Amino acid sequence: MSRFDSQCSSEDVNKEDECVPSSSEDSQDGVSSPMENDDEPEFSQKHYDIEPCYYSLTGKSDRNCRGIVYRYRQDSDLKGFQSHDGTLYRLRDSVFVEVSQNEPYVIAAICGFKYTKRDHVVVKLTRYFRADDIPEISLNLMKQERAELEINPHLCPQSLNRELFNSELQITQPVSCLRGKCIVEYVKDVRHARTVADFSLDNDTFFFCLHYNQDSTKLASTHYAIRVGTSFQATLPPMAECSVGDDSDRDELLYRPNSIESGEEEDYIKLARCYRTYTLSGNHMLDSQKNARSLQVSDLLMDEAIIQLHRSGYKIDDALSELNANDIILTTDVDNMTQDDAKKFAKGIKQLGKNFSRIHRELLPHHSREQLVSYYYLWKKTPEATKPKQAARRVNPTSIKRPTKEKVKASRPTSTEYLDFDSASESDVENNGPSGRACHHCYGAESKDWHHANGLLLCTDCRLHYKKYGQLRQIANRPSQVPACLFKRSNSDEEESGVRTRAGKKEQRRRTPSSMSETPDRRSPSTVSNGAPNLTAEETPTKKLNGSVKRAPKRPLHNGVINNVEKSNSSEEPASPTTPPPTLTNGLTNGHGPESSTPNGETISKRMKVEPSYDDDDDEEEGKMTIDEGDDDPMPVLNGFKKEESVEEIKLELNGTIKKENGVETDPTTPTCSMEAENEVCETPAVVSVEIRDETNGETNSDLKDDENVEPDSPEDTFELGSNVEFETKNAMFVRSIVRSCGPRCARTDLIFKIKVGGVWEKSIKEKEERKKVHLQNQRIQDSEKVAIQQNQIKKEQQQSQPTPQQIHQQQAQQNAQHLQQLQQAVMLGHLPPEVLRQMMPPQFGVDPTAILMQQMMAGQQSQGVNAAFQHQMALQQQLEAHQVQFQLMMAHQHQQKMIAEQQQQQRHAAAQQLREREQREQRERERERQHQQQAQQALHQQQQQHAAAAANQLNPAMMQMMALMANSAASQQDIARLMEMAAQQQQQQQQAAQAQAQRDQERERREREAREREAAREREREQAAREAAARDQAAREHAQAVQAAAAAAQQAQALTPDMQHMHLLQQLMLNPALMMQLQQAQAQQQQQQPQVTNPLQMLQHGMAAQSANQAEMMRRIHPEPAMRPQHQ
């Protein structure tokens, strides 16, 4: 039964209506909304007011757009919105919302529309989550559940990608973010998703069946159903046919009680504990380990002892032998930690944490990882591990440098092979031409606009598909060849005007953009021939330079000319995208084109630098040759030399000597260095300057025109391996290794150099090898000596660590003597009976049981006399202590009575003081009431007088009218009587009003007086309750003290048992060694004075008499006489 059973009913609820948020468009007061009436058009002017609204779109030339908002007249709520493109958005519609330009659309359901404070229309939405928005943990749980139910095989990848997750998250966005409507269908089960729509088509249809709670990050079903059926029932195992009695007993019996007598069992456990305590006492280990192992002497030892006794067949001798052997193994454990090891372990824990493998490898190699782990649980309870840490230093938050802009890490690495273009409008594309851009997904060159999405530049169709569905669309007829504009040209070896030396001291040469396209950073494909490996779009050629792998700089060549010159004519239109990219051969063309615009008289100068190196650290880079291209004037070179021109003169600068060989002239410009003085060869640059001049024209012209048309190498061009020596130096020979049919190309590709036999370089190499051999031989000798020394040290340590037979015998003798002494002490103290001692004595201790028995009997007879004297002394001491206890109790009772009397007197004083304060307070209240009454009477009298005066001064309007008539004419008797009657009525009314006012004042005063009396009564009740509680507490304390005193008296009155007296005497003797020595001396003197008798009974009697006298004297010295003690009165 699932957890949704209690929430289910007989009728399923339409969860689609529940999950989609409800809004105020529902009908009110039972009247249906006009939107639901089919007889009238939707949003008719009969029920709705149409209001225009204006908003702006980003990235458009016509930013201001005009839309329409529909307001319902009955409740003045916004029910719909029509955008500038004619899309009508209603409540509960599912829409696409653009939150970010580079991310997919957010799918949400419309809850309502409203105006902001600035009269901008915004839409309230309830968001759906995609699978990429759900946490990985929740998504994995869902996938695991579906895999168990075998749901995934029923769906295709497109269907799973269209799945959404409903939520209750409310968001608000402006209407300018709406990007169209979609359909979100609810399905009860994911297996029914196919019935909703065909998700392989771009029909803007999605489905959902689960609800996502953002607070708990959990996915739950939106459709509650009772899970009944075979799929949801547990598989019950078959009923067991055998009974419990048939099953074999798997418990192991460790001990069977009542197998031996209880006394023997207790003695056996005492002996085992004594053996282990003695064994651990002589061990040298850390306190933490000793404390941990001493726990095994307590209850754990008892368990181990009885288990071993059961395994030995309840033979006490065999069990003790096994336990003793285990104790010896326990003390000789090799994993004990020394103080230095403990310090290293604590240092490793603080620095490396609980990485016990590293601690074992770096700090404690002689301790295994298991030993370190077990020691850690002991170490962490020590004070060193539990001491508080130092307070961390506070860091000023203002000093921390924070990034000015947060960088969001992409979910997947973005390919660096594609170009990054800014957002562009349709007009920008037209200006750039059709070859300016291409889609990174479908390789299309035509699009309405270009925008970034998922880190790629996409066309309109690919971008909208990605924004809607969160994935790139499938391309049926995708071109197999990547467009040229999607590649970024790599820098080639020929791009730099000079090659870096091994030391890296050459400055980076000036680079110019390529003439194939206007964007120098764009990539173009290139195919490599003549034996060079083919490189794909994602591969980049690398080379090894100075021992490290670096990116090989490469740039294209045009017409066999190194692109070292800026483009002269920038107004030429680029090649169309339909033109195939030029085919390059080994980074160079044929060396000459059909239209050669290079005039005669150009000068080309190259410097060749030969750097011999004899460092011990780098053997592979001996005698490197690098060629430095001159960067004074950018000169085009065809295959290393101009084919049409002749080499007139080559200047070779080498070792300061001037030679002339085959047109090569040397001049002394480079200093020499002595090899014998420094044992090294200086870097001697050999500068080869090739100057090519034309006799007809000596002027140079660097204005070149780069043509877009590049011809590939001729298929007839061939090359072969050669061995001709081009020229020689003092220490090297330059050999042309590649002979091309089209002529020489470049010295870096066609020439190699070899070390000349008998030269300085060869000698230095041989000397270097000899030095290496000598160094290696010396190092081997030193290593062998170190190994021999280490082996000798190990042998010495092993010899020192192994004890000699004399030492072993001496240690065993000491251990036997100590153990025998302990057993003798135990026998003398009377802890072990003679029969048990004879049975339990281990065979390795050579002690005569008869002698031990005699000693025990004599000690027992002597102890009887000592016990009698001690009992008499203890009786006297008990009486004195009883008197002292009674006196102390009497004094304590008197002191307690005195304290109680003082407390009662203080309480009486406090009660009298409170009574006086209450009487004074009541008197002040009565005085205050009397004053109030007097003031009230005075005020009433004054008020009456004022009323009378006012009545006398103010006449009734009727009387005023009557007096005016009487002034005009003579007054009659009736008028006078009437006037008098009116005056009497007025006076009577005033008297009644004064009486009513007086009654009200009296009633108010009476209520105030009653309230004060009630407050005083409550105060008296609280005081009485406090006094009663204090009395109860005092009585309880007195009763407790009396009970405690009685218990103490009863405890002191109890007499000491003989065993307690015996133990007390032994304690006194052990605490006072001087008394023990005196007792032994007295016994020796008594034995010397007594006559020699052969009867052992007489010897025992004499010994007992002397021992009793000595014990009496000793007790007198230990306890002073009663007369000497101070008497308490």
Curated annotation (Swiss-Prot):
Upregulation: By starvation, heat stress, oxidative stress, and UV stress.
Disruption phenotype: Shortened lifespan and reduced survival in response to heat stress. Impaired differentiation of the Y rectal cell to the PDA neuron with the Y cell remaining undifferentiated in its original rectal location. Double RNAi-mediated knockdown with lin-40 results in delayed cell cycle progression in mesodermal and endodermal embryonic lineages, but accelerated cell cycle progression in a subset of embryonic lineages.
Biological process per Gene Ontology, one example term: epidermis development
Domain ELM2 residue range list: 224-327
Bias kind Polar residues: ranges: 1-11, 525-545, 561-573
Sequence ranges assigned to domain SANT in this UniProt record: 332-384
Keyword Isomerase: no
BAH domain ranges (all copies): 87-223
The name this protein goes by in its record: Egg-laying defective protein 27
